């Protein structure tokens, strides 16, 4: 009779484990491993190439998200320094205009007409405001008019998002100016970090309530990043970098147009241009080569067939030249009416 000592038991376990391991990996010892009716194989069958691709996609997605969050955090940290510098400059500017007028100092200010209009507009909104949260919301409408257009991309924006992946944040640098204006109007220029966060939370609730009324139309959706393919690897990388900054295809079109036709928008000559020549209505056709670049960047990102994407892209170009929403100041009365309610 075999006496099972501890040593014998350990040896038996090792032998059984090795035998089981060889049984599993040796197809000649177990022919049914190749049988498709084998339950475990059906349940756990994995194609190695497909698995590798999936893992690569997950890894890339994780890396992109990590990179995005890192960049957002860096921007937020930089914005804090910007806030302190901007506030000092703003207070000095306000002291300066107590002894003179904006008209007197305007010649020494770069882009003085735009600066003068901006200051006049935001001052009017501030004077009409009765509530800090409503003032912030109105200034968001004023400073980010393109986010509140027909594509309703504001749905994806928050001041203090719970998730930096699901929602984007408004430009922290513009938010700094809004914060300074609110502190001047309601808190005697005192820095109120905790109060500002509470106001931001209240404004986010207002944005959520407004978002519930709208959806982003399917024609403005963008493809998932992994499905975007350009004509080359370099093109694909460049397009993805552009798309990372956008919520909708309309926003992508606008971003590309502002880069390619910067001079037209800066000078105001954009009003005379459209996608095609239109002699009857007095419009000049845009540069064909630049328009081809717009199509090459935008169309691969749209979740529709290329012929349809081309038509939609053309419509979005014309729409933007008819009313370029990035130009602020057009909705001043709307903002004043909002804070006055």
UniProtKB/Swiss-Prot annotation:
It is a single-pass membrane protein. One of its GO terms (molecular function) is DNA binding. Pfam families: BEN. The keyword NAD does not apply. The chain crosses the membrane at residues 7-25. Induction: Expressed in the early phase of the viral replicative cycle. Residues 112-222, 233-328 form the BEN domain. InterPro entries: BEN_domain (IPR018379), Poxvirus_E5R (IPR004334). GO terms for cellular component: host cell cytoplasm; host cell nucleus; membrane. It is found in: Host cytoplasm; Host nucleus; Membrane. GO terms for biological process: symbiont-mediated suppression of host innate immune response. Changing residue 95 to K: Complete loss of nuclear localization. Keywords: Early protein, Host cytoplasm, Host nucleus, Host-virus interaction, Inhibition of host innate immune response by virus, Inhibition of host RLR pathway by virus, Membrane, Repeat, Transmembrane, Transmembrane helix, Viral immunoevasion. Interacts with host CGAS; this interaction inhibits CGAS-mediated type I interferon response. Major early protein present in virus factories. The presence of BEN domains suggests a possible role in organization of viral DNA during replication or transcription. Plays an essential role in the inhibition of the cGAS-dependent type I IFN induction in host dendritic cells. Mechanistically, abolishes cGAMP production by triggering host CGAS degradation via a proteasome-dependent mechanism. Belongs to the orthopoxvirus OPG067 family. This is Protein OPG067.
């Amino acid at each position: 009779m075999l006496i099972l000592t501890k040593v014998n038991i350990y040896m038996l376990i090792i032998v059984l484990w090795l035998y089981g391991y060889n049984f599993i990996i040796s197809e000649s010892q177990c022919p049914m491993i190749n049988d498709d009716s084998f339950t475990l194989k059906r349940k756990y069958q994995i194609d190695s190439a497909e698995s590798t691709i999936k893992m690569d996609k997950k890894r890339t997605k994780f890396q992109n998200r990590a990179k995005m969050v890192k960049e957002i955090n860096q921007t937020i940290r930089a914005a804090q320094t910007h806030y302190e510098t901007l506030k000092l400059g703003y207070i000095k500017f306000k002291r300066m205009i107590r002894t003179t007028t904006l008209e007197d100092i305007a010649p020494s200010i770069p882009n003085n007409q735009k600066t003068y209009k901006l200051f006049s507009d935001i001052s009017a909104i501030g004077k009409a405001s009765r509530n800090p949260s409503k003032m912030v919301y109105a200034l968001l409408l004023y400073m980010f008019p393109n986010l509140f257009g027909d594509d309703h991309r504001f749905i994806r924006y928050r001041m203090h998002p719970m998730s930096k992946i699901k929602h984007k944040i408004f430009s922290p640098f513009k938010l700094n100016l809004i914060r300074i204006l609110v502190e001047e109007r309601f808190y005697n220029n005192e820095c109120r970090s905790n109060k500002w966060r509470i106001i931001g939370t209240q404004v986010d609730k207002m944005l959520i309530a407004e978002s519930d009324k709208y959806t982003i139309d399917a024609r403005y959706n963008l493809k998932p990043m992994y499905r975007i393919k350009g004509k080359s690897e370099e093109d694909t990388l460049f397009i993805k970098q552009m798309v990372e900054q956008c919520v909708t295809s309309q926003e992508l079109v606008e971003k590309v147009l502002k880069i390619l036709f910067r001079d037209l928008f800066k000078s105001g000559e954009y009003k005379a241009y459209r996608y095609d020549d239109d002699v009857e209505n007095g419009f000049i056709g845009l540069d064909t080569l630049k328009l081809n670049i717009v199509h090459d960047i935008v169309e691969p990102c749209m979740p529709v067939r290329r012929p349809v994407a081309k038509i939609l892209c053309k419509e979005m170009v014309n729409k933007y030249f008819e009313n370029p929403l990035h130009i602020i100041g057009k909705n001043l009365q709307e903002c004043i009416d909002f804070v006055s309610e």
